[in-house]
Amino acid sequence: YVFYVLLVGLSPWVSIPYSDSTALIIPVLMLYLYTNVDTGGFKNVKIACFSFLGVLGYMIKPQTAILFISVFLISMVFIRLRYIKKTVKYLSIFLISILISYFSIGIFMSSNNITVNKELEISYPHFVKMGLNNITDGGYLSDDAGKSMSFRSTKERKEENIVVIKERLKEYGIVGLLKHQIKKTLVTYNDGTFAWSQEGNFYWRVNEEKSKIERFFRNIYYETGSNHSIFKYIVQGAWLTILVMQSLNTFIKRKDMDNNVRVILLSLIGLFIFESIFEARARYLYTYVPIFIISGMIGLNGFMDWMKKR
């Protein structure tokens, strides 16, 4: 709870109505439904709700689908053949719920009277291209963004992105790409504030202070504030502690690891792969902070159990 308060509850990202904070509850809520699917009844409803959250989360923040996929993969790999009939039943509910959720959300979106120009879409190749740039170590690069937006059609944009991707991979080579990946990982994982106040022209407008409370919080959260460095040190320490505790999961023996733990670890591995492929931003981890904290606690408990058995 302390880590959650420090990294999520007190994080200024909570106050930003953007996809990261909006989708914050989805991965942990999906994990809750998965870990409690066999308790308290209503299993079919829980599976349907899980499927709906997976589709909704993907549409808000694609990274949330990683935990969704992890649950599916673990469930399939560790399937019990003696329960094959029930498995087919629940899998059918799962797939049907996905289809219903997808089309229902699609109908809702199409009825909002907002016309979307598909030719202005920035697709996945753009973010792969940006993730390979060596100027910002895989982070946001205005030149890449401007180049992609200069094309009038999605087809032209994708073709240019793919050409640049191939060029950058060729320039790096295997060793160069590995070095780039190390730098990119630091960009993504080495900031407990999750890149607060570090993106573009961060403050569009700063209003005049009207109260002492306002001044108090500005001193904490604004990078020019007198207490901002203290805030950064505290959350950075909390974040690094979680990462260290998460690494302690290596002390958990395979026979002592249940599917719940497997889902958590696989989802975080999947998140790492996702961030390694696409544009690097520390903020993109924010939605998974609750999962990181749970993983850290599991790792700490596993390490303590390992120490007791020595």
Task: Please describe what each predicted stretch is.
Residues 110-211:
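Membrane-proximal stem/loop segments at transmembrane-domain junctions that anchor or position
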Residues 187-264, 268:
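Membrane-interface anchor segments at the N-terminal boundary of transmembrane helices
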Residues 1-6, 258-262:
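Transmembrane-helix signature of polytopic, membrane-embedded enzymes
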Residues 46-62, 72-73, 93-98:
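Membrane-interface alpha helices of multi-pass inner-membrane proteins
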Residues 67-99:
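Perimembrane helix-loop-helix junctions
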Residues 2-29, 34, 60-67, 284-289:
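Multi-pass, polyprenyl lipid-linked donor-dependent membrane glycosyltransferases
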Residues 28-49, 76:
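Membrane-interface transmembrane helices that cradle and orient dolichyl/undecaprenyl
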Residues 39-45, 79-91, 245-265:
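Membrane-interface helix-loop-helix junctions at transmembrane boundaries of multi-pass membrane enzymes
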